[in-house]
Amino acid sequence: MCFFSQPLLRTVASNHLRCFASTHAEKPFFLTCPIFYVNAKPHLGHAYTTCLADAWARYTCLRNQSVLKPFQEDYVASTYSFVFDYCDHSKTFLSCGTDEHGSKVCRAASVNNIDPQQYCDQMSPLFQTLCHATHVKYNDFIRTTETRHVKAVHEFWKRLNASGNLYRSKYSGWYSISDEAFYMPWEIDETNLSGVPVSKETGNPVEWIEEDNYMFKLSSFKNDLHKWLDSGVFPKSSSQSVWADIAHNIVDNVQDVSISRPKSRLDWGIKVPDDDEQTIYVWLDALVNYLTVTGFPWSNVNDANCKKHTLWPPDIQFLGKDIIRFHAVLWPALLMAVDLPLPRRLICHHHVLIDNVKMSKSKGNHIDPIVEQSALLSEEFNNHVITPAESDMLRYVLLRLPLLTFDGTYSREMARKMINTELVNWIGNLLSRITSESLNPEHSIIQITREQVDHMFHNDNMDIDFLNSLDNISHHFDQLWWYEAQPHKAIEEVLRVIRQTNAFIDRHSPWTEREPLRRQSVLSIVSESLRICALLLQPVIPNLSIRLLHRLGIYYEEKEEQNQLNISHRVRVLGENTGKLLRKL
């Protein structure tokens, strides 16, 4: 089954038509990040999620491009330029944002002696700054305090109410302010050492509440939810299919859920339409953000926002494992209730750990990603202005963590070792070798065909294995990233080829080669390997990859005169030498 096939899956239940997916010929690939709560500053977990989503958006535009094939006749020409246009807004759409309502925000604002709106206005820009610092190119950054979002939530509520899936009732149960979540009795641990009931899932305290709220008939959607989860909404890889099993278990035990709180207990939020004494549940409010960024409610066909209607539904929604109940159970049920198409894919990740402990405000073990970017450069570079290429380092380390398989521990020592070994030594030194004055006095790379390569390097099994790896790397990379949802393993595949490339140049020792053509052929093969690896790593380290490609004489801007010269002489002139690809930390 194709990872991103676009079938129109429908099922009829309770006289409602449930759209599991919709199709549109002109639809951009729509990716969403969960919006982040503003009760605390951004940490590494936020950076991981946004970088993952951004890298996926970039790879969406890069995959299956012909330039990923080695030894093409025109590989020195200007055909490279379009590949760098991976942020074309007509191809992908990435949304990020901040969740600004709820009890936790009120408490944080109170601690800082300011009103909630002022507090949100101070905190939300920090998350935008994080995106900019890590080169996350979002198309829309939504804040739930924006007027457009309030309008969207009100419209969604009205449609829910009109569907007959809401009712007023006395709600009694466990509620966690920390999680902004209602829990069933079986989800509570009342026997822990603290003596305070906590959520088994998160370990956060819960309290018993009794309120007169609006309830959503979540239990009536059990069958439809099971069918949707079975339709392949989570990737089929073992590391992702486990989330479908967890979601199925939640659905099995699901009951109707409260989707409002009394204003007397929660004033900071969006009020229920026509009932100012009730505040809409913060998670319903937050989930609707994915509709808001598409211009929902799409009421005016002449409105520019209405054109965004073609975005829906999301092609991928990224989420952390702690919010799976909301994205894989509550959210699809809400969409079913109002007959809107459901997300096509959910991709769930584990947590970034610090010293094997999850980051939390209470533990005080948050790491500020922007501060960490500078700290990675080590003490001697404290006053150094970070270059775009250097700012990719943290992004690289985070995306190398196996968080789509299990929790991963971050440490500065580990990060520096990874950067020095993989980026500085394996890739950077390899680039330096083939562009050095002693090894490449011509300052150019000759074009070599696959037939010439096979003729010159057909006697050594290690050479044959290396060239086969180079032929197949884009396919293996795509299989791991796109179909198995394992980007960290895709990166490892690139590193495997880089190691083979280093071994190749060591075997043939071009620095001892007396025949210029043989020496230049070895350099050409190494350059071609670096080119393809740099392109595949662009979604992960966009600036560093461009720096590498520039040194090889490959540009994303048009350089027609140079390109024609390259083609006529079957060489590619090296780009400007601006120093080492990346300095050792």
Stretches found by the model and what they are:
Residues 146-165:
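Feature captures the FAD/FMN-dependent oxidoreductase FAD-binding
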Residues 163-222, 226:
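Cys/His-rich short segments
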Residues 2-28, 68, 74-87, 93, ...:
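Basic, alpha-helical terminal appendages of large translation-related enzymes
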Residues 125-139:
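A glycine-rich helix N-cap at a beta->alpha junction
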Residues 24-64, 71, 80, 84-89, ...:
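Structured secondary-structure scaffolds
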